[in-house]
Structures are given as C-alpha cells and as structure tokens.
C-alpha cells in the first residue's frame, strides 16, 4: 500500500488537509499552533489506489515537545514514498519553514510543496517565494474550501510506484437522504463532505432534484443522494416530479437516511417512514437540529419520535446538528455497519437450531385448539435478509405475530437495525397432512 507523509511547521493547516483527504475529522483542528503532536494515520482511496496518509506534528515548534514530534515525523518518513510539505505563504517563509526544508533535503524523499490557505486565485501571488525552496512548482490549495486537491493528488500519484497488482474496486454504498422540506438534508450533506455542493436556504423546497455526491470515508466509497423534500400533498407539478425523483433515488440506493427535524415533527414523518420501510432498504433515522431541543423537552421529543416512527421502531437513530457537525461521523459509521448486515447470509443449520429453541420457549398462535407448527427455515435472499419458513398453516400467522418474530430474528441473529422479510410456505416435504396435524394437537 502507498504511504504519504504530511509535514510542516505548526499551524499551516496540515491536519485540515489530512481530514479533508481522508473524509473524516480524525485529527484535531484549531486556530492555535501545536494542536497535533502525535503522528496520525488515515486511509484514503484515489482513482482506485489505496493511500495511507500520515499527519505529523508541527516541526520546529520551539516548545518542549519539539524533539518528540521530530522523532515521530522521522518514523513516518521511513515507509513513505512521497512527502507533502505544507506551508502558509500568506505569512511568508519563516525560519521554521527553512529548517523543515533543510531536513527534508537530508531525508531524500520526493517532496511536493503545498501552498495552503490560497482561497482564491488572487492569493496565488504569494507562491513566488516558495520557488526558492528548490522543490519545484508549488501546488496552491485551500484545505478548508477543498480547492486544488485534485491537482495535489495527481502530483502525489506521479511519485508513487505502480501497484504490483490491481486493487479490486470498492463498490460504493449509495445512500439517499429523504425528509420533508427544510429539515436540513442539504446542510447535512454539506457537513459530511465539507463542501457547498447542495444549495442551503431557509425557504422550504430549495432542493428540487436529486443530487449525487461521491465521497470516501475510511476507505469506503459512498454516493450520497440528496433528494428533494417530500411533502404530504404536492403543491405544484415540480413538487410532484420531485417526489417521483426521490422515490426513484430510494430504489437506486442501498440505504436510507430519514432526516427529521427534532424541533418540528408532523404527520409527514409517518408517510416517509412507510415509504422507507416498503423499500426493504436499511433506514437510519437522523434526528437533526438536536442541539436546539431544550433539556426539559428531550423526553417529550423522544416520545413523539416513537409514536410517529413506530413502523420502523427497529431502525437506529443518530442525533445530529449539521451546523455544529455533531453526529456526522456516527451517520457514516452506522451506515457501513448496517450495509454489512443487510447483505449478510446466515447458515441454514444455525437458523433451524434457533427455530427449534424458539418454539420450545415461546408460545405460538393457536386457533381452535390447533397450533402453528414451523418445521424448517432457510434464508432465500439477502438485501434485505429474507427467510422462508415451512409450516403447517400459513393462515395462522397474524401480522402482530410476524412482527414479533421479525424483531426476535433481528435481536437473536445479529441483524439489529435492518429490515427482515418472512415468506410462509405450506408446500414441500415439511408439509404435514391434516390427519397428522390433528393427531399432534
């Protein structure tokens, strides 16, 4: 696997660049120097190449940690094929910058000079001084605004050796964000990707079409689909079209984020919950604007959520604030976990051991003295996990009992949080004759 080290003096934006490239907030970012002291590693994917990035502490900081930080940076250099040397040219080259440059010449690794905090083309006048370092043409970027990153990564790739073998492409997880207008879907998308790809405004219905955004998190590719807000009754032909686009996006997705406004929930949420449930896709309920709920209202808000979303009570919840970036990491981590469960397959032998124990311990439906008997169970599909159960009388299975059984399957068979489907079958070698049934009751 390729390895690239990010170095520079304190407070030039190394950690901001690291976080931007790996797609999550792993390193602590602040406006004062010396925040990062340890070397942090993160995995990113670029054009199907896996690259380990190492974020090092600020070199030549002049504080008590300087020797330890330099030692860790030297360790990071050992396996690196290239070095990204980050500077803030707006402040001019400092003595520490020249010290780092001299050290890099002794190390002897390929160096890409990065001029960070170049937020607009007019700031590129600051780049002239960097030529004097002797590392070639600097790359102008803004880690905060994601400017110039493709050019930087293309430059990095020129210094990395060719892969010995092709890395199998990681299939992306497609996630749709659904919710009624103005619950913060676009703000969440922008917070996740650290971009302004989606238009955000206070007026409901800003997003009229589905918007696909590709992103990487911990080596996993995602395609995030920000759908138009779904109203209970479309006001216009455009709204009607938006609903169709949203429903189509759900069908193309592997997973759904159902975004609700913690401070303003209505009957719309029940409709959306049903829409999500019927799709058979895993659903994560994203309770946005949670920071705006007063402490004394937390229990009541939870009660409202339970009532309006009872149809998908099994779905996990993540409490977020798009404005404060609260809960953003959990949204992606939970999505990866649910996606794995959604595609999982359980051995038939394990299913039938569970079924046997279940019937011994739990009461089953009983009609006029005759009991439901379940003889055999097997998984017939994944995504969602679907199980066929052979029984004596499928008509004995009530909706309430099936829901209860689905919940137990989720809890007992490590499928918590994902939809489960059951197919009842009276045919096959496990079907008993009427005479046999009567004799066993």
From Swiss-Prot:
**Family annotation (Pfam families):** KH_dom-like, MMR_HSR1
Query: Where is the secretion signal located?
Result: none
Q: Which family does it belong to?
A: Belongs to the TRAFAC class TrmE-Era-EngA-EngB-Septin-like GTPase superfamily. EngA (Der) GTPase family.
The keyword Ribonucleoprotein is assigned to this record: no
Q: How does it assemble?
A: Associates with the 50S ribosomal subunit.
Q: Name one GO molecular function term.
A: GTP binding
Domain called EngA-type G: residue spans: 2-164, 173-343
Picking any one GO biological process from the record gives:
ribosome biogenesis
Superkingdom of origin: Bacteria
Name assigned to this protein:
GTPase Der
Q: What does this protein do?
A: GTPase that plays an essential role in the late steps of ribosome biogenesis.
Taxonomically, what lineage is the organism?
Answer: Bacteria, Thermotogati, Deinococcota, Deinococci, Deinococcales
């Amino acid at each position: 696997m390729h390895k690239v080290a990010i170095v520079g003096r304190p407070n030039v934006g190394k950690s901001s660049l690291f976080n931007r490239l790996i797609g999550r907030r792993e390193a602590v970012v602040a406006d004062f120097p010396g925040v990062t002291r340890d070397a942090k590693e993160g995995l990113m994917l670029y054009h199907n190449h896996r690259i380990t990035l190492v974020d090092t502490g600020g070199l030549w900081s002049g504080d008590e940690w300087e020797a330890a930080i330099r030692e860790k940076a030297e360790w990071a250099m050992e396996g690196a094929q290239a070095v990204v040397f980050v500077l803030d040219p707006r402040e001019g080259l400092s003595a520490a910058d020249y010290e780092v440059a001299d050290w890099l010449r002794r190390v002897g690794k390929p160096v890409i000079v990065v001029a960070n905090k170049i937020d607009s083309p007019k700031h590129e006048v600051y780049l002239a001084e960097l030529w004097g370092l002797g590392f070639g043409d600097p790359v102008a970027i803004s880690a905060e605004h994601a400017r110039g990153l493709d050019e930087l990564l293309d430059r990095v790739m020129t210094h990395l050796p060719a892969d010995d073998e092709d890395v199998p492409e990681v299939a992306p997880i497609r996630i749709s964000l659904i919710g009624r207008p103005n619950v913060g879907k676009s703000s969440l998308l922008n917070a996740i990707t650290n971009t302004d790809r989606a238009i955000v405004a206070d007026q409901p219905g800003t997003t009229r079409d589905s918007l696909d955004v590709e992103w990487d998190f911990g080596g996993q590719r995602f395609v995030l689909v920000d759908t138009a807000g779904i109203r209970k009754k479309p006001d216009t032909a455009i709204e009607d079209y938006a609903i169709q686009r949203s429903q189509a996006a759900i069908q193309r997705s592997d997973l759904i984020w159902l975004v609700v406004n913690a401070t303003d929930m209505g009957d719309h949420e029940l409709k959306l919950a049903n829409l999500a449930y019927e799709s058979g896709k895993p659903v994560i309920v994203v309770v946005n604007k949670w920071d705006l709920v007063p402490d004394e209202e937390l229990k009541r808000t939870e009660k409202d959520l339970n009532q309006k979303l009872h149809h998908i009570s099994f779905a996990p919840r993540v409490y977020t604030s798009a404005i404060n970036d609260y809960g953003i990491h959990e949204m992606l981590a939970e999505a990866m976990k649910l996606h794995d469960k959604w595609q999982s397959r359980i051995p038939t032998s394990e299913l039938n051991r569970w079924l046997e124990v279940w019937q011994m311990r739990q009461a089953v439906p009983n009609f006029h003295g005759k009991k439901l008997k379940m003889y055999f169970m097997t998984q017939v599909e994944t995504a969602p996990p679907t199980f066929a159960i052979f029984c004596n009388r499928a008509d004995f299975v009530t909706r309430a009992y099936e829901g209860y059984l689905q919940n137990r399957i989720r809890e007992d068979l490590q499928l918590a949080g994902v939809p489960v489907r059951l197919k009842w079958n009276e045919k096959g070698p496990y079907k008993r004759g009427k005479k046999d049934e009567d004799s066993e009751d």
